[in-house]
A protein has these predicted regions:
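Short catalytic-loop micro-motif centered on adjacent basic/acidic residues
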Residues: 1-2, 22-24, 76-80, 103
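A short acidic, Gly/Pro-enriched loop at the edge of an enzyme's catalytic core
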Residues: 67-77
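Surface-exposed interaction regions that form or flank ligand-binding interfaces
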Residues: 53-69
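Short amphipathic alpha-helical segments and helix-helix/interface helices
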Residues: 11-15, 31, 35, 67, ...
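SAM cofactor-binding core of SAM-dependent methyltransferases
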Residues: 1-56
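C-terminal substrate-binding/active-site "lid" region of AdoMet-derived donor-dependent transferases
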Residues: 77, 83-165
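Short beta->alpha connector loops
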Residues: 6-9, 82-86
Length: 165
């Protein structure tokens, strides 16, 4: 069972490979487009696609609210590729099963890496994390195995939650 923050082509890819995928999208236009793809590919039974408007002053973060409703230890993977990445990544750590995967796309914009990235807008070790929430996330996942991938334009990281963690 997986959770995807930010729907798109990856929604179809993951839906074909997992038992059930919940996906949250903030763009109404993009939500409709992905919903059409899901119907055309006959994946409706395997995908629950949610629309969550962006947060406004005085209105709680809808992405974060959706993540908080998920039972702890219930997800095999989380893909973070949408808005509020820092808050969502941090909140998702407890939602993963032991050995679960937390995948963050475009991570070079938010977290530095030991071996510097050549991706544009990459964070240096000197600059550190992009926010206090990212710093907290980095500390929380420091003991997790990490697999970094880059195509020179963007970086993606897979964090593997420790067994028993």
């Amino acid at each position: 069972m997986g959770l995807e923050i930010g729907a798109g082509a990856s929604t179809i890819w993951f839906a074909r490979r997992c038992c059930h995928l919940s996906s949250i999208e903030h763009s109404e236009k993009w939500h409709r487009k992905v919903q059409d793809w899901i119907k055309k590919k006959k994946l409706e039974p395997k995908v629950t696609l949610y629309f969550a408007e962006l947060a406004s002053p005085g209105i709680p973060n809808p992405y974060l609210g959706a993540v908080k409703k998920i039972p702890n230890g219930s997800l095999d993977f989380v893909l973070v590729d949408g808005k509020y990445r820092d808050a969502v990544a941090l909140a998702s750590t407890n939602k993963l099963k032991s050995g679960g995967l937390l995948i963050i796309d475009d991570v070079h914009r938010y977290l530095p890496r030991v071996i510097p990235s050549s991706a544009p807008f990459a964070r240096s070790n000197l600059a550190g994390c992009a926010s206090d929430l990212w710093r907290e996330f980095e500390e929380l996942t420091a003991s997790w195995e990490q697999v970094w991938r880059s195509d020179g334009v963007q970086d993606t990281v897979i964090f593997i939650k420790p067994i028993g963690g």
